[in-house]
């Protein structure tokens, strides 16, 4: 593996918009990630952008593969998700995965959807976005060459103004 590149992106002024953050896995290895500090400034929500590092997958899937449909073992993918979930202080049973297909469907999810797309099948065919107002859930979306839209508000839905 090559040497890690430290990345720090700032906008005009001094506010950092994307930072690196490492978590320690149960086995002592590191789970490197990126995050948007602006989304965490009030301490209510947490965000994480995974890299390909810090997981258990091998070969062409090395190391933090998060998809099962391409030949990696389900056990490896589940362990990799366990590492992501642990960074959020939870486990894969509280993760909800989406399946993007370049449409415009946004699904509202809640506790009843926990584990969907990972520990149990999805109840919908696709969702290009997921949203929740329930704490303790990890919403997971997958991107390769698309820009992921991320938004957050601490207001309740009926208090939000457009």
Features from the language model and the residues they span:
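A short aromatic-anchored loop/beta-hairpin motif
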Residues: 4-120
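Conserved small/polar residues in nucleotide/adenosyl-binding loops
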Residues: 153-162
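Soluble metallo-hydrolase cores and metallopeptidase-like ectodomains found primarily
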Residues: 126, 133-134
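Short connector loops/turns at beta-strand edges and beta->alpha or beta->beta junctions
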Residues: 53-57, 146-147, 155
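Short beta-strand scaffold segments in enzyme catalytic cores
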Residues: 129-130, 139, 148-152
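Short acidic-glycine loop/turn motifs at beta-strand connectors
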Residues: 134-135, 155
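Helix-hairpin-helix/helix-loop-helix acidic hairpins
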Residues: 137-143
């Amino acid at each position: 593996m090559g040497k890690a590149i430290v990345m720090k992106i700032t906008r005009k002024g001094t506010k950092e918009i994307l930072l690196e953050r490492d978590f320690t896995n149960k086995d002592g290895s590191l789970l490197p990630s990126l995050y948007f500090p602006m989304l965490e400034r009030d301490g209510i929500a947490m965000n994480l952008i995974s890299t390909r590092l810090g997981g258990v997958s091998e070969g062409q899937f090395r190391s933090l593969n998060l998809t099962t449909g391409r030949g990696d073992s389900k056990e490896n993918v589940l362990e990799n998700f366990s590492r992501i979930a642990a960074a959020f202080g939870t486990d894969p049973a509280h993760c909800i995965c989406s399946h993007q297909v370049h449409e415009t469907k946004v699904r509202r999810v809640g506790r009843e959807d926990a584990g969907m797309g990972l520990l149990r099948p999805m109840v919908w065919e696709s969702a290009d976005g997921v949203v929740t107002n329930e704490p303790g859930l990890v919403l997971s979306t997958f991107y390769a060459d698309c820009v992921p839209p991320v938004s957050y508000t601490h207001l309740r839905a009926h208090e939000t103004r457009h």
